[in-house]
Amino acid sequence: FYIDYLEKFVAIKRGINILEIGCGEGGNLLPFAEKECNVTGIDRSEERISQAISYFNLLGFNGRFIHSDFFDFSSEEDMNKYDIILIHDVIEHIDKCRKVEFILHAKEFLSETGIIFWGFPAWQMPFGGHQQICRNGFCSKMPFIHLLPLSVYNKILFIFGENDSCIKELLNIKAAGLSIEHFESIIKESNGRIVDRILWFINPHYKQKFKLKPRKLMPILSSIRYIRNYFSTSCFYITK
């Protein structure tokens, strides 16, 4: 899906440079490697980077994978300028006080004609708190639970047996939660420009997960500030 969408803005062909920040096991970069793009992935998880390297080696594709916190990764260490930077399910995890810093740092790696793709769930959508990572079936399937007051949310997670690391991660996500309005304001604050936006009622990734056909949010809902956050399971942006 990335390829079809991004080709509207950049010709995806052999030799262009692609960077994914928060690349995980490298799955998002594989379609670009298949088209002989130069792909680079960075992730702060050493285990995920090892998995990405093994995955690409197994399939016989070239890819460069770097274990580092992106904030610690200097553009002086990487002389490449990237035609496309992918940032999917990352910005909503960044502390609110560092989001603008993150955006500005990402732009340092962008070529003059390059674009940044952003994908994130609107904070107020039913599972915007990523509570699906909970081990307990009730917590993982309960929509909007992340919107409860902090003390109540913490108590529920504890009562239903979530471990300390899971609770900590979920509370960090709650503290960093990102709405559509907030994202657009920090893009503006970082002197960025929004080239395109798609708000999804049914996330394209749900097609593979749940066999659901992707559906865009109705234009009338997309235009209603704040309310649209409750219905946007994924937000796609192209910025410069």
What are these regions (language model features)?
Residues S45-E47:
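Conserved SAM/SAH-binding beta-strand->alpha-helix loop
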Residues F160-K240:
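A C-terminal cap/extension of S-adenosyl-L-methionine-dependent methyltransferases
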Residues V100-E112:
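A short glycine-rich, Lys/Arg-flanked "PGG" loop and its adjoining helix->strand segment in the class I
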Residues N38-D43:
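Conserved SAM-binding motif I beta-strand of class I
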Residues A52:
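Conserved SAM-binding loop
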